[in-house]
Amino acid sequence: MATIDIRRAHALSTDEAKKKAETLARGMEDKLGIKWRWEGDRIKFDATSGAAKGVTGVVSVDPKSVRVEIDLPFLLRAIKGTIESRVNEKLDEVIGRA
């Protein structure tokens, strides 16, 4: 079960939603050193070093929503609320609200 689980409705085409999800993943890669890869309609990501070390997760895209599931290592759970707020802000910026 994910430590953080956020679903955001969208009114985009699936292809456009996938492009937006990739923008989100690239931002995590640039800022946190997270590695990511597409597996079907899902981006799987993890961090093996840096401030986000131990973080794993998935960004799933379907025709009506984008879902972000993040598993935080024990030490980062203390700032779960901050991380969740930042993910929501980034989703607002990249995907918007339907």
Predicted regions and their residues:
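Intrinsically disordered, low-complexity acidic/polar segments
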Residues: 15, 54, 77-79
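Terminal, regulation- and interaction-focused segments at domain boundaries
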Residues: 1-34
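Ser/Thr-rich, low-complexity intrinsically disordered terminal regions
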Residues: 22-23, 27-63
